[in-house]
Amino acid sequence: MLGILNKMFDPTKRALNKYEKIANDIDAVRGDYENLSDEALKHKTAEFKERLEKGETTDDLLVEAFAVVREASRRVTGMFPFKVQLMGGIALHEGNISEMKTGEGKTLTSTLPVYLNALTGKGVHVVTVNEYLASRDAQQMGEIFAFLGLTVGLNLNSMSKDEKREAYAADITYSTNNELGFDYLRDNMVLYKEQMVQRPLHFAVIDEVDSILVDEARTPLIISGQAQKSTKLYVQANAFVRTLKKDQDYTYDVKTKGVQLTEEGMTKAEKTFGIDNLFDVKNVALNHHINQALKAHAAMQKDVDYVVEDGQVVIVDSFTGRLMKGRRYSEGLHQAIEAKEGLEIQNESMTLATITFQNYFRMYEKLAGMTGTAKTEEEEFRNIYNMQVVSIPTNQPVIRDDRPDLIYRSMEGKFKAVAEDVAQRYMTGQPVLVGTVAVETSELISKLLKNKGIPHQVLNAKNHEREAQIIEEAGQKGAVTIATNMAGRGTDIKLGEGVKELGGLAVVGTERHESRRIDNQLRGRSGRQGDPGITQFYLSMEDELMRRFGAERTMAMLDRFGMDDSTPIQSKMVSRAVESSQKRVEGNNFDSRKQLLQYDDVLRQQREVIYKQRFEVIDSENLRDIVEGMIKSSLERAIAAYTPKEELPEEWNLDGLVELVNSTYLDEGALEKSDIFGKEPDEMHEMIMDRIMTKYNEKEENFGTEQMREFEKVIVLRAVDSKWMDHIDAMDQLRQGIHLRAYAQTNPLREYQMEGFAMFEHMIESIEDEVAKFVMKAEIESNLEREEVVQGQTTAHQPQDGDEAKQAKKAPVRKVVDIGRNAPCHCGSGKKYKNCCGRTE
């Protein structure tokens, strides 16, 4: 009954029927375009753009646009997309995944929706897994687009910012997923809008979509730099704070745990460090270190707030009294306590920006993908990316012979059988592709074949260009190729002369992967475009997957039958058990990726807020209103802390409030206790705010409006960037320890969301306080440069070669871009990183 219902309501079947009708319409107008001259065909692009401007949609133009690309492709490359390729292209245009078997021409299929969507002028990104494929496709398919008058850009890791900007400005941009993600992060660290390279994310077509959105979904892209806080500064600040006297040099409020330098304390600091003004923009880092050292000495008590254990500072939970191992105070307070206790100061490298592929690609207005194998991950694509998987039929029926698995007792017996099978096929001249799960297996089989004197090539997914070349030759007579799973993906194996008569390409699998999709990819290497072929998997009871579903029982059964190591069994029961084991593993992997996304969504929402506001800052001409708003909020919180509602007015610490207001917003003696005595908090706020605004206006008059506007930008950008980087670090530490909350019968995700939100709120307050303090206290130098914004903190540089970190079997791998000290600085100053943003003192 269920089967009948599935047939009636199968969404793929419905979609295919719809696509076939549209493909027939495209076929019907074929003759009209064949008769057009080259010029008339090229002119169609301008005509389509005009019609879009007049209100037509890309859907309205689909039939004509596809017919134009089809004809242009025939004239330029000699390739004419088949009807099934038209159907694949329509699926892509609708933001779905086209599952097209190997050799069915996915690259050519993509040109159809890419052209149609590029007509909008918003830019289309074609995403591939490596730079070799991006370069190859940009060159080959770029000819079709160039013929039709569209521009094509290629975005590579080695390019300068100007070259990248040009590549992104093109109608169509070919790039790798890594480069797109890193460019997005770097764009949100620039100081001037003109330094950004990407345009808003419009439409992306991802080749090998399962590899990028599933296999690499858990891989965070990370831009990191040396931790901005110099160890030396912590030690110096600590030594200085030890010389200060309470109430004379600093004040401490027990209730709020607030510590503040008095005017005397500030003068002492300026003398000790040989500077004119502690609040000058260039002394931001020093000021921060002194504040944290003060807090460490005055507010943080040993054995109350923290303990020292095994040379480490361990935080004590103030509610439960438990030790919170692995957690560190943020904003450099932890390092300040380490300096106070005379311990080694841990100065890890710092995460400056991070995003996962899942969240990067979900930002596109429309997303589509192509692969030979996506059906097994259909649920994941639907739930996480809202994309349907549409299996496109092959142009010619598949006549490949997929043989049942051969199961051996031991690995040794299995590998001997594989070598024997390869040797026999080699003797007849039939080409063989041996697929392995791990590099060690490739090397072991290579050794066995060497012993038999069989020449062969080994591929380990390291050199993409060489790889593509070897894979192309893997279908020639007598070729033997050993490849790990991902090697040579994206390149077709075309059969050489006389190979069809020998049975086509033989694919030999040496074990089942935990994902059926990877097994299907290996099978799909053979039997392309109706060619003959054969696939055979060899398994052993010692394989990891076999051990998972209880191979012991089967082993005992084999023993009873007295089977030796050289005799295989072919059993449907075992094959079914393997498949159900694979389904279980796939389910677990999906759950873990889904969970990662739920955690990552917390940071995603925060990232979007910060990046949006940061862009508004660099895009805005005048930040005065924003800064005034920040000062208001900061002052409101300060007044609320010193005038709590639950206390009587005579209990309020007005002396503390006056000290704070004068040292943070005004000048020594500008506010007296008598000015605010007897007033309500909102009256105090209004009066103090008036005085602050008077000082603000005087400052603007002295320095000139233009200089003041740039100064505000410098202060706001520096505060946002440094606090956001601290926040990313703190969120990372929270994330690493949060699973332990499950032991306390709480939901770790819920706790992470709540604490993450509280930390974000605190970060926003912290930004407002810092902006208020520095705008009011810092002096403006006449030659103010926005680059000063990053002094004392690191920003990013280009990713280094080889950052395509391979996914480990279980744990997520981090893709990290580190900054070389002698590399040119990212901020565009032209100086070396170590002499510019990487300067730590």
From Swiss-Prot:
Region (Disordered): 786-812
Binding partners and assembly: Monomer and homodimer. Part of the essential Sec protein translocation apparatus which comprises SecA, SecYEG and auxiliary proteins SecDF. Other proteins may also be involved.
Subcellular location: Cell membrane; Cytoplasm
Gene that this polypeptide is encoded by: secA
Pfam families attached to this UniProt entry: P-loop_SecA, SEC-C, SecA_DEAD, SecA_PP_bind, SecA_SW
SMART domains per record: SecA_DEAD, SecA_PP_bind
Keyword set, alphabetical order: ATP-binding, Cell membrane, Cytoplasm, Membrane, Metal-binding, Nucleotide-binding, Protein transport, Translocase, Translocation, Transport, Zinc
UniProt: ATP binding residues: Q85, G103, E104, G105, K106, T107, D492
Gene Ontology CC entries for this record: cell envelope Sec protein transport complex; cytosol; plasma membrane
Gene Ontology BP, a term: intracellular protein transmembrane transport
Function of the molecule: Part of the Sec protein translocase complex. Interacts with the SecYEG preprotein conducting channel. Has a central role in coupling the hydrolysis of ATP to the transfer of proteins into and across the cell membrane, serving as an ATP-driven molecular motor driving the stepwise translocation of polypeptide chains across the membrane.
Species whose genome carries this gene: Bacillus velezensis (strain DSM 23117 / BGSC 10A6 / LMG 26770 / FZB42)
Required cofactor names: Zn(2+)
Protein name: Protein translocase subunit SecA
Residues that coordinate or bind Zn(2+): C825, C827, C836, C837
